[in-house]
From Swiss-Prot:
Pathway: Amino-acid degradation; L-arginine degradation via ADI pathway; carbamoyl phosphate from L-arginine: step 1/2. Pfam families: ADI. It comes from Borrelia turicatae (strain 91E135). It is found in: Cytoplasm. This is Arginine deiminase. One of its GO terms (biological process) is arginine deiminase pathway. It is an enzyme of class 3 (hydrolase). Its EC number is 3.5.3.6. The active site is at C399. InterPro entries: Arg_deiminase.
Length: 409
């Protein structure tokens, strides 16, 4: 379906029309206990079941009128348009995979060029093993010293979480600089899609690029309304990045008049702002915080006269902050009702990380039964997806999706 703008996201809850996903692939099969921590996984999901669960996720979306787009298809369409773009993409991917020797670079180029574009993209995500390049021999010191390491190019298992590499804001996007080196290759795909894909090139303003020197991740970016954007200052996103995004949005005269920077704890439990709260209805949010916990927030606004950004700081309860800037009292539904045992367990399994597909309609993990029951009692329509394997990646339905089109509310 064609839309007036290829990116249009002015809320967290407007009816979802088009969404970007990545279906788990062989990258999960290349995770091993010795490298999973470095690749930001706490456990190894079973691929066959993870795919079944992800298919169920996509089916829920499609059954509710959402067009599902897969990132591997978008990037394949992008680089198939022009041989020079494909050549450039392959060279950049190999370089950013840490390959520096001429012989190994050429061996990988030959390997990738002998595949279809779709198979090549799948293999880039899955990782390249020594067995894949059986004919490649090297007497370099680095190759010999690391002879027991089975991978030449590491897998990209975190690309499952399409929320983070770029973020849709209004009619534009931020193409993010990821905090961890192992995730930075993921944003190459977004860079090429928005630069060369016929639907997106020349039609999508870029609010932030992956070449910036400060970090920003999509899990910290929440579009609260046409006027208000929230960004977390977190373990993964730096305060300087918030200012850069704010300045771009203000200078380009977008509808966003206030950027709220939330300073959250620097810990894995609060990895991104969407682990602290997500919006599920006009005035209803899920959260994983205590009633008396106060946040330091910084409200960034623009002075048209001087062309400068004004920053006002305040410390208040989350519900008071959201209520003030949204203009109405809000309701906070705590993960598992705030129960010390159920709340901690269900937060670990992303009980508060919901994906709104329309106001008052959310996709959740089936396993978080206490939180799900509370949502239903509150009148929220809950679509439950299986998650025994996907939850091992420590990301919920919101983490695994990037809205491209939402209806206005």
């Amino acid at each position: 379906m064609q839309y007036l703008k290829p990116i249009s996201v002015f809320s967290e809850i407007g009816r979802l029309k088009r969404v970007l996903l990545h279906r788990p692939g062989e990258e999960l099969e290349n995770l091993t206990p010795s490298i999973m921590q470095r690749l930001l996984f706490d456990d190894i999901p079973y691929l066959e079941v993870a795919r079944q669960e992800h298919n169920a996720f996509a089916d829920i979306l499609r059954n509710n009128g959402v067009e599902v787009v897969y990132i591997e298809d978008l990037i394949s369409e992008t680089i198939s348009q022009c041989d020079s773009v494909k050549d450039q993409f392959i060279s950049q991917f190999i370089f950013e995979a840490g390959i520096r020797t001429e012989n190994k670079t050429q061996a990988l180029k030959d390997y990738f060029y002998n595949m279809s574009v779709n198979d090549m993209i799948s293999k880039m995500i899955a990782g390249v093993t020594r067995d894949d390049l059986k004919n490649y021999k090297s007497d370099s010191l680095n190759f010999l010293v690391n002879s027991e390491y089975p991978l030449i190019v590491d897998p990209m298992p975190n690309i499952l979480f399409t929320r983070d590499p770029f973020a849709s804001i209004g009619h534009g996007v931020t193409i993010n600089r990821m905090q961890t080196r192992v995730r930075r290759r993921e944003t190459i795909f977004a860079e090429y899609i928005f630069k060369y894909h016929p639907i997106y090139r020349d039609n999508v303003p870029i609010w932030y690029t992956r070449d910036e020197d400060t970090t920003l991740e999509g899990g910290d970016e929440l579009v609260l309304s046409r006027d208000v954007l929230a960004i977390g200052i977190s373990e993964r996103t730096e305060s300087e990045s918030v200012e850069k995004v704010a300045r771009k949005l203000f200078q380009q005269k977008t509808s966003f008049s206030t950027i709220l920077a939330f300073q959250i704890p620097q810990s894995r439990a609060y990895m991104h702002l969407d682990t602290v709260f997500t919006q599920i209805d006009h005035t209803t949010f899920t959260s994983f915080i205590s009633d008396d916990m106060k946040f330091t927030i910084y409200a960034l606004t623009y002075d048209l006269g001087s062309g400068s950004i004004k920053v006002k700081s305040e410390k208040a309860k989350l519900e008071d902050i959201l209520g003030f800037y949204l203009g109405s009292k809000v309701n906070m539904i705590k993960c598992a009702g705030g129960d010390l045992i159920h709340g901690a367990r269900e937060q670990w399994n992303d009980g508060a990380n919901t994906l709104a597909i329309a106001p008052g309609e959310v996709i959740v993990y089936f396993r978080n039964h206490v939180t799900n029951r509370l949502l239903e009692e509150f009148g929220i329509k809950v679509y439950k997806m299986p998650s025994s394997e996907l939850s091992r990646g420590r990301g919920g339905p919101r983490c695994m999706s990037m809205p491209l089109i939402r209806e206005d509310i």
